[in-house]
């Protein structure tokens, strides 16, 4: 455990940020899972609606640095291709 006051403060801040980031990541994954569920069910219109919401969340997380921009692009392109396959 840290002995210096500033190090103690940093440890507290780091833990608070870790918990916040974990909840944000969990929320993002939930949006992604919703799109996968709609695709698996074969519901194109519902999948497209969920995809639009998922895009917003994933882009926001990428802009904040929670995930890499390429990971965000990978999620979006992968799901867009799956939605496009639905007839």
Curated annotation (Swiss-Prot):
Keyword check for Ribonucleoprotein: yes
Pfam families documented for this protein: Ribosomal_S20p
Gene3D superfamilies attached to this UniProt entry: Ribosomal protein S20 (1.20.58.110)
GO cellular component: a single term: small ribosomal subunit
Entry's Gene Ontology molecular function annotations: small ribosomal subunit rRNA binding; structural constituent of ribosome
Positions of region (Disordered): 1-27
GO BP term (any one): translation
Membrane-crossing segments per the record: none
Basic residues bias locations: 1-11
Keywords: Ribonucleoprotein, Ribosomal protein, RNA-binding, rRNA-binding
Role of this protein: Binds directly to 16S ribosomal RNA.
Family under the similarity heading: Belongs to the bacterial ribosomal protein bS20 family.
Record's protein name: Small ribosomal subunit protein bS20
Organism of provenance: Haemophilus influenzae (strain ATCC 51907 / DSM 11121 / KW20 / Rd)
Gene giving rise to this polypeptide: rpsT
